[in-house]
Curated annotation (Swiss-Prot):
This is UDP-3-O-acylglucosamine N-acyltransferase. Keywords: Acyltransferase, Lipid A biosynthesis, Lipid biosynthesis, Lipid metabolism, Repeat, Transferase. GO terms for biological process: lipid A biosynthetic process. PANTHER family: UDP-3-O-ACYLGLUCOSAMINE N-ACYLTRANSFERASE, UDP-3-O-ACYLGLUCOSAMINE N-ACYLTRANSFERASE 1, MITOCHONDRIAL-RELATED.
Length: 359
């Protein structure tokens, strides 16, 4: 389905520079777009691609359109302060228009406990399990093999993709997206040591600590494929509104993730850690337990956080990749730091002694 620029602006705002009746039916990058497609410029370093693009129209910020000057002539633009966000909204609209609406109802192979509440407008796919006391609200979509445990609520308009599992006693807010294989509410990693003696004479074992809390997920949260969020030991693990979590992230028990925070893939957050609002956690970052990150903290990829960081800012502890030979030289220097320190101390002592003799 193609829409005119005028129709897009009526839906999403912005101003048109060029032909308001230009029709676009999809999106593409600047260097690949054709006359019936919409492209966008989010980074000024690609400004030259706007001059050569074949796109029917381009989403562009006012300052970048000014930089184009005469080169903008004859082209069509939607001028908006945030072309990237505009692109995302238009892309979602085209996806929604192209996606057939699934009929409400329960697939014959699904297992729904008689004590569960399932809204008439919900879509329940093949082999879904909904246990007693669970509540499936209006417009929820549960794809094949989804599991919803006893007493759990799935908020209105949420979509759980195939094989997602939400254990008992959890609350998922409205409009949540939980991707395939994600597990919400599995037991937190809690074991009490019960050992006697030392060394080879040590006897005993680890005693499992029952995890009696749940997981509370706010509205508009998205959780990536194969991500795991542990239930709390006593109180709930909490994911606040509009948090976005990538694939294969581990969030330990009793954590609280503040609203609008984003967490990239393979990050690990140990138990009882609090992350503030509007934070950004890079891929494969590791955050120790029982620490607090303030609002607007950014942790770069592969960094390790071992203490609280209350002040907003960018924090890094990862070592960037370098030439292999350079890395070996650096590693050798690190191994010899103790020897170098002792040599420096000896030189300082000798200089001090020499200075004392001269005096």
């Amino acid at each position: 389905m193609a829409l005119t620029l005028e129709e897009l602006v009526k839906r999403f705002g912005g101003e048109i520079a060029g032909d308001a009746q230009c029709k676009v039916g999809g999106l593409a990058p600047l260097d690949q777009a054709g006359p019936q497609q919409l492209a966008f410029l989010a980074n000024p370093k690609y400004l030259s691609q706007v001059e050569s693009t074949r796109a029917g129209a381009v989403l562009i910020a006012p300052k970048d359109l000014e930089k184009l000057g005469a080169a903008a002539g004859g082209r069509n633009f939607i001028v908006t302060p945030n072309p990237y966000a505009y692109f995302a909204r238009v892309a979602q609209m085209f996806i929604d228009l192209a996606t057939p609406q699934r009929a409400a109802g329960v697939h014959p192979s699904a297992t729904i406990d008689p004590a569960a509440q399932v809204a008439a407008s919900a879509v329940i796919g093949p082999h879904v399990t909904v246990e007693a006391g669970a509540v499936i609200e209006d417009g929820v979509q549960l794809d094949a093999n989804v599991f919803v445990g006893r007493g759990t609520t799935i908020g209105a308009g949420s979509h759980l993709y195939p094989n997602a599992s939400v254990y008992h006693g959890c609350k998922v807010g409205p409009r949540a997206i939980i991707h395939a294989g994600a597990v919400i509410g599995s037991d937190g990693f809690g074991f009490a040591p019960d050992f006697v003696g030392d060394g080879d004479a040590r006897t005993g074992s680890w005693v499992k600590i029952p995890q009696v809390g749940g997981v509370t997920i706010g509205p508009d949260v998205e959780i990536g494929a194969n991500t795991t969020i542990d239930r709390g030991a006593m109180a709930d693990t909490v994911i606040e509104e509009c948090v976005k979590i990538d694939n294969q992230v581990q969030i330990g028990h009793n954590c609280r993730i503040g609203a609008y925070t984003v967490i990239a893939g393979s990050a690990g957050i140990a138990g009882s850690t609090t992350i503030g609002r509007h934070c950004m956690i890079g891929g494969a970052a590791g955050i120790a337990g029982h620490v607090t990150l303030g609002d607007y903290v950014i942790i770069t990829a592969k960094s390790g956080v071992s203490k609280s960081l209350p002040k907003a800012g960018i924090y890094t502890s990862a070592f960037p990749a370098v030439d292999h030979g350079e890395w070996n030289k650096s590693a050798a220097l690190v191994r010899n730091l103790d020897k170098l320190r002792e040599r420096i101390k000896a030189l300082e002592a000798a200089l001090a002694a020499q200075g004392g003799t001269d005096a």
